[in-house]
């Protein structure tokens, strides 16, 4: 039987990023053959990734990449906020964003396939399920800028614009804070407007106001609704005395489009009863 030295284990750990004991076991199984041991670990890490696939990944980070006139914003999920802060996980998320910007995949499934080897490797290292949840690529003749909020990187935006990068970045910060649904009123679908109009009309009728006054009330509330959900109509968070459209115009800038994400939006997180888990473990 080949002797397994500490240096061999350390070298394999450096090459794979896996635990010392896992690397030692692989070297023993491979009878000291480094390449074979690395192959064994790759196979086992794939099995580990499959084993964890059913667990809910509701934490994570956002990452972006801008490659010339192509930009990508991605959300990559893991199971715990502890792993979400891990440098290796963040590096994986950045790799996913870079891959999305370079390859411009057509779907999450296609992007996931492109990064599957790296995903399995980081799962094997950190022991949590991870997944590419969503992404968007903007391929444009215009300019691009991104803003990721805070050290935890859980909210962010990719902005397509014309004009000043500094102004566009400030507007990106506004988008994260104020959460507009679209850039302008023209992008709000008619069905949404009519639904709101119906609600406001019924409320006005119920208030007993005369028809002409009720009609004016409805139109006023529709204007307010559109201002609240559109970027151009919102009061600019850095100067509420002007709208975002006014701030952009006076600084020679126009926002063409944007995509905004918040990690975990719409994912139902599992509620863990740790007391019950400890009690159950104590009976084993």
UniProtKB/Swiss-Prot annotation:
The gene is tsf. GO terms for molecular function: translation elongation factor activity. InterPro entries: EF-Ts_dimer_sf, Transl_elong_EFTs/EF1B, Transl_elong_EFTs/EF1B_dimer, Transl_elong_Ts_CS, UBA-like_sf. This is Elongation factor Ts. Belongs to the EF-Ts family. Residues 80-83 are annotated as: Involved in Mg(2+) ion dislocation from EF-Tu. The keyword Chloroplast does not apply. It comes from Neisseria meningitidis serogroup C / serotype 2a (strain ATCC 700532 / DSM 15464 / FAM18). The keyword Amino-acid biosynthesis does not apply.
